[in-house]
Amino acid sequence: MPHSYGYRARTRALFARAFKTNGPVHLSTYLTNFKIGEYVDVVGNAAVHKGMPFKYYHGRTGIVWNVTKRAIGVEINKRVRHRIIKKRIHVRIDHVKKSSCRDSFLKRVKENDKIKHDAHVAKLPVPSTKRLPVLPKAGAIIKSKGQVPETCHAIPYEHLV
């Protein structure tokens, strides 16, 4: 059993920085703009102790609900027994990065809008933009070029003892 149950207990590997990424924080971290409603990833940066999130929130994705001078408010879903609670925390900008969780969705929306616009311009009916599961492969005819196909059967089981 561990001796202490402190705020940062057992976070040696959790907050450890990756190989060759030690040292001061890059300026681009502070120049990033965050808007209310954006998705962000909470990732604790061990180089900056101020405004560091509690270890539970490390690696979680949330939505920005408040922006201040040096920190942003992030709303994160936390499962407590049988229910999910929305937790609102303030985290310094050093410990937050923009999430790429919606990139594929936004790309798909853009492509669908383009398809609909092109159909409208060409005065064609709007095609369905729903994603469909992959269908089974179509049947094919195999040519044997004069060779007779051989029928395979399972070998009957024989008791060898």
Swiss-Prot record:
Signal peptide: none annotated. InterPro entries: Ribosomal_eL21, Ribosomal_eL21_CS, Ribosomal_eL21_sf, Translation_prot_SH3-like_sf. GO terms for cellular component: ribonucleoprotein complex; ribosome. The keyword Metal-binding does not apply. GO terms for molecular function: structural constituent of ribosome. It comes from the Eukaryota. One of its GO terms (biological process) is translation. Keywords: Ribonucleoprotein, Ribosomal protein. PROSITE patterns: RIBOSOMAL_L21E (PS01171). Belongs to the eukaryotic ribosomal protein eL21 family. This is Large ribosomal subunit protein eL21. It comes from Cyanophora paradoxa.
